[in-house]
Amino acid sequence: MQSTLSQSPGSRFSQYMALTKPRVTQLAVFCAVIGMFLATPGMVPWHVLIGGTIGIWLLAGAAFAINCLVEQKIDAMMRRTAWRPSARGEITTPQILLFSAVLGSVGAWTLYTFTNPLTMWLTIATFVGYAVVYTLLLKPMTPQNIVIGGASGAMPPALGWAAVTGAVPGDAWILVLIIFVWTPPHFWVLALYRRKDYENAGLPMLPVTHGEKFTRLHILLYTVILFAVTLMPFISGMSGVVYLASAVLLGAVFLAYAWKIYRDYSDELARKAFRYSIVYLSLLFAALLVDHYARPLLGV
């Protein structure tokens, strides 16, 4: 009975969807869409909004599918990822490669057709940065994998901005910098309470190579830097007081988590901090959007 169910169309679709890491993709695409809206004082043209969103989503999914393929043996050794269809051998290597190729090709065509060549090439470069540079080279070789590899994961706002304007100005790079600095503490709190998983899989995550205390200190330091970086949209004039108030409040909570982790660590606290870090980034970018359209009305 179970074998029959696993081959049903709905189940097969779910297996392929799992390869795209939907929750991670959703956050990345959300940040890209915010970048689109911040790039213009008015509304984003519908063909750009829809085409850009779909294209970025497809190429992100293609990159995550390659990641699942490369790490299928590693995923099988980790409780957090052992459920993935690639780790369980439910989808073959040729099937994953074909799936990724189709997603990537359709995504690139969509971006070229509905946005512009710059967006397509930047998104392809992001694909290569994540699927090849991070997954194949950085992650298995250095504890700084998240710091260096975070550059590709930080690109969505720039992709969205480029989709609308055909350029990536300084304000877009500020948004990229926010995600770039957010990435290490976000993943390091996960690595703290999943340390055994990473150790068993042979991955040189910071808690494995440098220990818990060193990692806790770096989480705190990066969170302090993140707090400062999130003030840059206000300082640059891109955003107003609505965003500033949101950034300070959200950042204060994140700092409180980082301080508690540094002073009195527990796995449960790290889990809460990890979940909050996702909420934090989502609300921070939502605040950018609200401020963008509320600012002219409020005159602040």
From Swiss-Prot:
Enzyme's top EC category: transferase
Topologically, how does it sit relative to the membrane? Answer: Multi-pass membrane protein
Tagged with keyword Flavoprotein: no
Which stretches are transmembrane? Answer: 24-44, 46-66, 94-114, 118-138, 146-166, 172-192, 224-244, 278-298
Which keywords label this protein? Cell inner membrane, Cell membrane, Heme biosynthesis, Membrane, Transferase, Transmembrane, Transmembrane helix
Its pathway is: Porphyrin-containing compound metabolism; heme O biosynthesis; heme O from protoheme: step 1/1
State any single GO MF term.
protoheme IX farnesyltransferase activity
**Looking at the UniProt record for this protein, which Gene Ontology cellular component terms does it annotate, in alphabetical order?**
plasma membrane
Give compartment(s). Cell inner membrane
The task this protein performs is described as:
Converts heme B (protoheme IX) to heme O by substitution of the vinyl group on carbon 2 of heme B porphyrin ring with a hydroxyethyl farnesyl side group.
Q: Which family does it belong to?
A: Belongs to the UbiA prenyltransferase family. Protoheme IX farnesyltransferase subfamily.
- Please identify the protein, giving its name as recorded: Protoheme IX farnesyltransferase
Taxonomic source organism: Burkholderia ambifaria (strain ATCC BAA-244 / DSM 16087 / CCUG 44356 / LMG 19182 / AMMD) (Burkholderia cepacia (strain AMMD))
Q: What is the lineage of its organism?
A: Bacteria, Pseudomonadati, Pseudomonadota, Betaproteobacteria, Burkholderiales
